[in-house]
Structures are given as structure tokens and as C-alpha cells.
UniProtKB/Swiss-Prot annotation:
The keyword Ubl conjugation does not apply. Belongs to the glycosyltransferase 37 family. It is a single-pass type II membrane protein. Its EC number is 2.4.1.-. Gene3D superfamilies: 3.40.50.11340. This is Probable fucosyltransferase 9. Expressed in leaves and stems. The gene is FUT9.
């Protein structure tokens, strides 16, 4: 007899500038450990995600890094080019990262306009956490890909809770921006009105072919960024930015699709990712390794409620309510898991399956930057990623991350209008890639939008772009 487990997780998800509730429901297949039937070499390859992960880490300090016992082997294998690029990046980060002579030289240049260029100097991109956890993970992967393409070292602002969520991803070095970084007291003040904002400098004609190269610039890549800020995605602007030692990025978006629209990047990206829809899947599994505390939440929930199921389905429901508030219809939707539990306890399914309903947590308000709340949210994302099938909601960054980590093409629930179910109510995603919700659909990229066959308008948002593999389109 088939056993179907339904796990329901509730949390509030912050997407774009709105505080939006979401409910997550999880169900899934029971697997034997993925190493069963594999020889030693195949087991090692699976442990390292086909070569994505480096060896040399102390395993007990970050159990999630090599633990594949709860997931199926991914059918998407990384190319030898991305594996080689990651190993090269690790060497670069080790040579240029915090505490090195190169890092100290680079920080001394901050505040000076006349920059010495010796050819072997290191360049950096600093990631700043913005908005909710889903937005942060999407933008972090985007910035990391930009670092790979431009041979920069990526450092992340550690002043929030990132060390409570994720282990260090790079061997024998740190991705954390040191607390004594010379610009630390200015980072929070970086905005589009700042004198070092690239878009503002363009708007004020502060940058031209004869401009002195600044030591650092701030890049504003948000859902409401101005046209001048979107010049970041233009080839000629990248040529200028390439000369700047320090870039600071604030973003709440997955802007990877538009990196593919930059001609000099596209050539590299096609080699790195011959399967276009695997960018987030590979880079997220490389970068993100939950801390032991978070991984404990995942494994305890999985082993207690999901491991014995024959099939698991994850449902992530995002509620669109304006103005943001505590509405009864929202709570009715969140508490629907209790109704499902009672229904399946009182009567069997028509085909005889055993069906269970599970709700990992019951968070009712968004509490970004509160340690335990963010840890629970991350654990729920991973539980959703461990499903066989996934249903997500329109424009949900929470859902985007789960589908990408799990290598899943979800069914996407359309946004209700006037509290009525749309017809049709959902659509199958073209790919497992997240949507760049506010892609620059005009300007320097307007002429190239229709050319690449691997870029499509998102199913869930008409101003968004996503990567697809054309042969896999439905």
C-alpha cells in the first residue's frame, strides 16, 4: 500500500517590498541511500555532487555539506568547465581573501582615485543582504556568478545572521567580509542617492571615457532600480566596471538571466552551463550548506515525518493581501493543514493510500534577521527541496530557491484575483530556474532580448525573464 506524506510548513515570506504570508506543504518518495549499488568512485562523485564540491573540509563542522542521504542523485551533472572554474575560483579566493597580503593592499587603496594596476592585483565584489531570506539567497547566487565571470573575489557582509545559517563554502579561507573592513561604517548608507552609486554617477555625467577610475562603486540592482542603474547590464559599462577594484552590490533579485544577455559573458556562460536551466541548481548547491543547527532541524523533521513515505509532494502557498495585515482568510489558508489532518484521520482515500499531513512550523509574521526565525525558514526551504513534486506560488522567492535546490520544475499557482481561483489555476514551469522579476526589457539589451532561444518571459510575471532549455519546453 502506497503511503503519501503531506508536510505543511507555514511562514511569512517577504518578496519585493511586501510582507507576504506563505504556507508550505510537503510530501515525498522514500529512497534507499543514494550510494546503494554504487562503487567507491561513484559514491565519492555523488558525495561531491559530481565534482561541484571541493575536498578537504572537516566534515563534522558542517554535516550538510556532504550529506546526500535524504535526496535523490541529481540528473543534472555539472560540466567540466564549471567544475574547473570553481577550483580556479577557490585558488583565487585563497590568494586574495581576508588576511592575505593582496587583501591588505586592496583595502589600502580604498578612498584613493589614482589606482595602481600591476596586473596581479585582486578585485572584489561585496554582497549586502537585502529583504527576506529567499531574496538574499537568489541575489547571493547572482553576485557569485558575476564574480566567477569577472574573476573577482566575493565577500559577504556578516553583520546579520549569515553565520547562523550557512557554513563557509570555500576551503581554507573565508567568504566573510572582515568586521574591520574600511568601508563598514558606510555600507548601510549606500543607496541610489550616494555619490558612489554607479547609476547616480551616470545620471550626473560623472563617468565618461576620461574619468579617473574610482577605488570603489556601489551597484543598485533592485526591483525599482532606475534606467541608469540598469546600465550595469550593458557591455560598455562592464568594460568600465572591470577597472574598479571594489564593487558593493545591494540587490533583492535573481539577475542571472540578464548576465546571459551581455555578449562577453554569454560566451563564457554557454561553456560553463551547457544546460542553461542548471545555473541556480549547481551554484546554490555549491554555495549553500546549512549550519549544523539548521541541518538538525531538517534531518529531525525528515526522519520523523517524511522518511517513511513512498511519495512526497511539496506545496508552497503564498497569500497576496494588501494592505499587509492579519486577515482571517489568510489564517484560514494557513490552518488548512489542520483540516487536512483531520480529514485523512477520519476517512481513508478512495484508492487506499495512507495519507499524512505534516506542518514543520507555524510562524505567523515575517521576522527577517531574527536568528531562530531565519533558521526555521531555511530548514523549510530545504524540506520543500526534498520533495518529488512541488507546487509553488507566483513570484515566490521562497519557492524559487526550493525548486532550484531540488532540481524541480514546479507547478506554479497563478495569483488569485478578487479572492477567486484563476482559470486555469496553475501552469507547469518551463524550467527549474528562478525568474528575474524585474529584468531590463529596454535599453542596451532590448535588441538582444528576442535572439537567445534560452531566454523566455516568466510564466508568473510578464516583466520577468528566465533561462530555459529549449528542448525541454512543454
Amino acid at each position: 500500500m502506497i503511503k503519501l506524506t503531506i508536510a505543511i510548513a507555514t511562514c511569512l515570506v517577504l518578496c519585493l517590498v511586501l510582507l507576504l504570508p506563505s504556507s508550505n506543504i510537503s510530501y515525498r518518495h522514500k529512497y534507499d541511500l543514494p550510494t546503494n549499488g554504487l562503487n567507491d568512485s561513484e559514491q565519492q562523485s555523488e558525495k561531491l555532487l559530481g565534482g561541484l564540491l571541493a575536498t578537504g573540509f572537516e566534515e563534522k563542522s558542517c554535516l550538510s555539506r556532504y550529506d546526500q542521504s535524504m535526496s535523490k542523485p541529481s540528473p543534472y551533472k555539472p560540466s567540466r568547465h564549471i567544475v574547473s572554474k570553481l577550483r580556479s575560483y577557490e585558488m583565487l579566493h585563497k590568494r586574495c581573501g581576508p588576511g592575505t597580503k593582496a587583501y591588505k593592499r586592496a583595502t589600502k587603496q580604498l578612498g584613493h582615485n589614482e589606482l595602481s594596476s600591476s596586473g596581479d592585483e585582486c578585485r572584489y565584489v561585496v554582497w549586502m543582504p537585502m529583504f527576506g531570506l529567499g531574496n538574499r539567497m537568489l541575489s547571493l547566487v547572482s553576485v557569485f556568478l558575476y564574480a566567477l565571470l569577472t574573476d573577482r573575489v566575493m565577500l559577504v557582509d556578516q553583520r546579520n545572521d549569515i553565520t547562523d545559517l550557512f557554513c563557509e563554502p570555500f576551503p581554507e579561507t573565508s567568504w566573510l567580509l572582515p568586521l574591520d573592513f574600511p568601508l563598514n561604517d558606510q555600507l548601510d548608507s549606500f543607496n541610489r542617492e550616494h555619490s558612489r552609486c554607479y547609476g547616480t554617477m551616470l545620471k550626473n555625467h560623472g563617468i565618461n571615457s576620461t574619468s579617473i577610475i574610482p577605488s570603489h562603486l556601489y551597484l543598485d540592482i533592485f526591483h525599482d532600480s532606475r534606467d541608469h542603474d540598469k546600465k550595469f547590464f550593458c557591455e560598455e559599462d562592464q568594460a568600465f566596471l572591470d577597472k574598479v577594484t571594489w564593487l558593493v552590490v545591494k540587490s533583492n533579485l535573481y539577475f542571472v538571466p540578464s548576465l546571459w544577455m551581455i555578449p562577453s559573458f554569454q560566451t563564457k556562460l554557454i561553456k560553463l552551463f551547457p544546460q542553461k536551466e542548471t545555473v541556480f541548481h549547481h551554484l546554490a548547491r555549491y554555495l549553500f550548506h546549512p549550519t549544523n543547527q539548521v541541518w538538525g532541524m531538517v534531518t529531525r523533521s525528515y526522519n520523523a515525518y517524511l522518511s517513511r513515505a513512498d511519495e512526497r509532494l511539496g506545496i508552497q502557498v503564498r497569500v497576496f493581501s494588501k494592505p499587509v495585515g492579519y486577515f482571517q482568510h489568510v489564517m484560514d489558508q494557513i490552518l488548512y493543514s489542520d483540516h487536512l489532518k483531520n480529514m485523512f484521520l477520519e476517512q481513508a482515500s478512495s484508492t487506499g493510500e495512507t495519507i499524512e499531513v505534516y506542518q514543520p512550523s507555524g510562524e505567523k509574521i515575517q521576522q527577517t534577521d531574527k536568528k531562530l526565525h531565519d533558521q526555521k525558514a531555511l530548514a523549510e526551504i530545504y524540506l520543500l527541496s526534498l520533495t518529488d513534486e512541488l507546487v509553488t506560488s507566483t513570484r515566490s522567492t521562497f519557492g524559487y530557491v526550493a525548486q532550484g535546490l531540488g532540481g524541480l520544475k514546479p507547478w506554479i499557482l497563478y495569483e488569485p484575483r478578487d479572492k477567486k481561483t484563476p482559470n486555469p489555476p496553475c501552469v507547469r514551469a518551463m524550467s527549474m530556474e528562478p525568474c528575474f522579476l524585474r529584468a531590463p526589457l529596454h535599453g542596451c539589451q532590448a535588441k538582444t532580448i528576442k535572439i537567445p532561444p534560452f531566454v523566455r518571459i516568466c510564466e508568473d510575471w510578464k516583466t520577468g525573464l528566465k533561462l530555459v532549455d529549449v528542448s525541454d519546453e512543454l
